[in-house]
Structures are given as C-alpha cells and as structure tokens.
Amino acid sequence: MKYDKFSLRKKYLSKRKKYSLRVKKFNFDMIFKLIKKKFSNKKITIAGYYPSNYEVNILSFLKSAEKKNFKIVLPVIGVSNKMTYKSWAFMEPLYVSQFGTLEPKKTNKEIIPDLIIVPLVAYDHNLNRIGYGKGFYDRNLQKISKIKKNIVSVGMAYSFQECPTIPISKYDFKLNYIFTEQGIIKPN
C-alpha cells in the first residue's frame, strides 16, 4: 500500500508519541566520530535543535559538543518563514517562536553551520525524510549546500520511524546520514 506524505506524517507522529519514551539510550559518540572523520580536528559549527513533540532529545550531545569547544547554533524562523541559524550557548535563555519551538534571541549572531542535525518524522534507507511539512529544512539545506559545498546533514530519529519508502518531490533534500539508537544509516 502506497501512502502520501500527509498520511505518513500522521502515522509516524503518532508512533513517535507512543514509543519514544521507551527508547532509553542514544549513542551520540557516533556523531563525534563522524565529525572527526569528516572534519579532522577542526572545531566546526554544529546546528542542532531544541527537542519538542517527542523528537530525539539531543541536548546532552549539544552540551558535550559545547564543552569540546564546538560552536552551537539553533534554527530561527524569521521573515517570510526563512530559516537561519543563530549562535546559542547552552545556558542562554530560549524564546518561544511563532511555531511553538524554542529559539535563541533573534539578535544573536547568524552563523552558517558545517553540520546540521535535523529532527525527523519518518525516514527511509535511501536517506529521504519527512518533516513537519513546512519545507524549512529542505529550503535551508538547498540554500546552504550552494554556499558551503561540504555541508553535512544528519537526521535524528528512532528506529521505529523507518518507513519502507518515502515519497519524494524535486524540493526534498536527501540527507547525508541518519542516526538512530541502533546505529547509523549511510549512503549506499
């Protein structure tokens, strides 16, 4: 049976709400190993997200990354629903956005990251993803990949969010990697 994105989004959001609290441990060392492999010892800028709606909680990873002197940025949705990344230190206050997500101050410095961590609603083994349906990450990744050729995109999901096939359109941006509690999905 073939599903459209709307149906898949609804199904996997429900699954995530139901099962996410059962997953106890994520091994974020895998991301640090990827960073070392891709960027050597360069102190890169990492774009994370503040988890909501049962997304994978990456806060311990962001805190560890900050302690290792990586710059941390979080997404901010601005004028015309354009997504940028603003600097954020772990203990700085965050503010509720128009979409109910937490963001750094809009006056914080805008930085283009080297590695972008993307929350996922669903994914397939071909590194396709479904998000919340607004296209923020797809548009943003398209734009940044033209500016920074070696940008690395990493999806974060639970293994139960895997879908046999994700329907794709010309606007969808394929990820470089997907991390789950069971390991890493790499390009074939």
Label the predicted regions.
Residues Y50, V76, L120, Y158-F160, ...:
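Short secondary-structure boundary segments
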Residues E55-I58, Y137, C163:
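Short, well-ordered alpha-helical microsegments
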Residues S52-Y54, V121-H125:
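Short glycine-rich anion-binding loops that position phosphate/pyrophosphate groups of nucleotides
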Residues L8, I31, F136-N140, K174:
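Internal, well-ordered alpha-helical segments in soluble enzyme and binding-protein domains
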Residues K63, Y132-D138:
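Charged helix-capping and loop-helix junction motifs
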Residues M1-Y3, K17, N108-I116, H125-N128, ...:
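Surface-exposed, charge/polar-rich loops and edge strands
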Residues Y12, G48, I72, I117, ...:
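A residue-level signal for conserved active-site and pocket-lining positions in enzyme catalytic cores
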Residues M1-V96, T101-P104, N108-I111:
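N-terminal active-site beta-alpha-beta segment that forms phosphate/nucleotide-binding
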